[in-house]
Amino acid sequence: MAKHRLQQVADTMQRVLGDVIQKELKDPRVGFATVTGVEVSADLQHAKVRISVMGSPEEREAAMAALQRARGFLRKRVAEEMSYMRFVPELHLIQDTSLDYTMHMDEVFRAIQHERLVNPPKLDDEQ
C-alpha cells in the first residue's frame, strides 16, 4: 500500500482514538492520556498506538492497564468512524515516554547552564 495512504489511515486513527479516549471513555484511571502517534503496518493488520499519560508512575500504569482493557471498545469505535475500511487493524497500545525523556534532558541542560553561571569556565589566559 502507498505510504501516503498508510499515513492518511494513521492520521485518521490518531484523531479518532484521541477523541474517543478524551470524550467517551468513562474510566477515571485514564486521566490525561494523549494519542501521540499511530503507525500502521503495510498490510493494515496492525497499528502501534503511542499514548502519553500524565501522572505518577502508578497512575500511568493504571491508565495504560485501563486503556488495554478498553482496546476492544477503541477498535470498535475506529471501525464505526472509519467504516470505509474493510478491515480495522489490531491495536497495540504503547506508552510514549518521549515527553518524559524530553523533560529529563531539559532538566539536565538547565543544571549545566546553572553550573556555568555559578562557576564560569576559566579561559586559557586565566589559568
UniProtKB/Swiss-Prot annotation:
GO terms for cellular component: cytosol. It comes from the Bacteria. The keyword Chaperone does not apply. GO terms for biological process: maturation of SSU-rRNA; ribosome biogenesis. Keywords: Cytoplasm, Ribosome biogenesis. GO terms for molecular function: ribosomal small subunit binding. It is found in: Cytoplasm. Monomer. Binds 30S ribosomal subunits, but not 50S ribosomal subunits or 70S ribosomes. Belongs to the RbfA family. One of several proteins that assist in the late maturation steps of the functional core of the 30S ribosomal subunit. Associates with free 30S ribosomal subunits (but not with 30S subunits that are part of 70S ribosomes or polysomes). Required for efficient processing of 16S rRNA. May interact with the 5'-terminal helix region of 16S rRNA. PANTHER family: RIBOSOME-BINDING FACTOR A, CHLOROPLASTIC-RELATED. This is Ribosome-binding factor A. It comes from Chloroflexus aurantiacus (strain ATCC 29366 / DSM 635 / J-10-fl). The gene is rbfA.
